[in-house]
Amino acid sequence: MIEADRLIAPISNHFKDEEVIDRAIRPKKLADYQGQDHVRDQMEIFIQAAQMRQEALDHLLIFGPPGLGKTTLANIVANEMGVNIRTTSGPVLEKAGDLAALLTNLEENDVLFIDEIHRLSPMVEEVLYPAMEDYQLDIMIGEGPAARSIKIDLPPFTLIGATTRAGSLTSPLRDRFGIVQRLEYYKVADLQHIVQRSAQCLGLSMDSEGALEVARRARGTPRIANRLLRRVRDYAEVKGDGHICAQTADRALNMLDVDHQGFDYMDRKLLLAIMEKFSGGPVGIDNLAAAIGEEKDTIEDVLEPFLIQQGYLQRTPRGRIATDRAYLHFGIEK
């Protein structure tokens, strides 16, 4: 099994065909945005205040693990403000001219959403600073002694940046965001509501117990919950009568090798490698990546956050350590 095939991976090329469905079931308004109560309450006030002043919303940085709804929240902000949203990502903006082209096409109070903003090149960042602060674009024309700088006025706009690695942002960029929101892993009750809403949007027959079973195994992540829901739907249609109850969901998820903690093959492989190959740790990230045949970034950004948050794994200065809870989960004696 490779990373692209992981059913519970928050990001997967294998499921790009279902991105259209993902967009269809995303909430469009704050009132429909389930969970993240502190974020929703704050953003409701900030948006209303900006509308009362007839101003652009202050620049917004959203960070947190993958799949928690950063893109969804950015689109909700644009919808609530009643403005257009332009979407791009850090790696796509290779040259200053790429960013300049986007900025000069914005209308007043529009939203520019940059995903993976921590991957912006230093050259592009330099162009972004005056645009965020003064709504001006500084562009160099020509080269050498004949080079000159021209300033282009921009309409007021809102930059929304999303990242899984807030610590990788440079201080000058991070300090220019007036609003910073961290998304946390979702509670099971909130995920249950999300699954029920998605089932309704997809026209599925599902009871609350079935939704709860899916929510329990979704690793606190809405994107994973919706993906599991679609696979459970397939199972229910082929092996049952189409209705999703707790028993059907349990059988489907067991077949998919997703256990009651939301662990899949790669989670178990990582924890077992630490316990069996490295005597429980500590083990460095390079050795761990080599042992399980996975990229370091995938381990740090996709696998580890949930395992650490749930208390199965610890990061220490000396390396990764499997906790007592991990040994208990697998029934292995230390």
Swiss-Prot record:
Cited SUPFAM superfamilies: P-loop containing nucleoside triphosphate hydrolases, Winged helix' DNA-binding domain
GO MF, one annotated term: ATP binding
Stretch list, region Head domain (RuvB-H): 260-334
Database matches in Gene3D superfamilies: 1.10.8.60, P-loop containing nucleotide triphosphate hydrolases, Winged helix-like DNA-binding domain superfamily/Winged helix DNA-binding domain
Keyword Nucleotide-binding tagged: yes
Compartments it resides in: Cytoplasm
Region feature (Small ATPAse domain (RuvB-S)): 187-257
Region (Large ATPase domain (RuvB-L)): 4-186
This enzyme's EC code(s): 3.6.4.-
Residues reported in the UniProt entry to bind Mg(2+): 71
Catalytic activity: ATP + H2O = ADP + phosphate + H(+)
Alphabetized Pfam families for the sequence: AAA_lid_4, RuvB_C, RuvB_N
CDD domains, alphabetized: AAA
GO biological process: DNA recombination; DNA repair
Keyword Cell membrane: no
Gene Ontology CC: cytoplasm; Holliday junction resolvase complex
PANTHER family reported for this sequence: HOLLIDAY JUNCTION BRANCH MIGRATION COMPLEX SUBUNIT RUVB (PTHR42848:SF1), PTHR42848
Family, per entry: Belongs to the RuvB family.
This protein's name: Holliday junction branch migration complex subunit RuvB
Organism: Vibrio cholerae serotype O1 (strain ATCC 39315 / El Tor Inaba N16961)
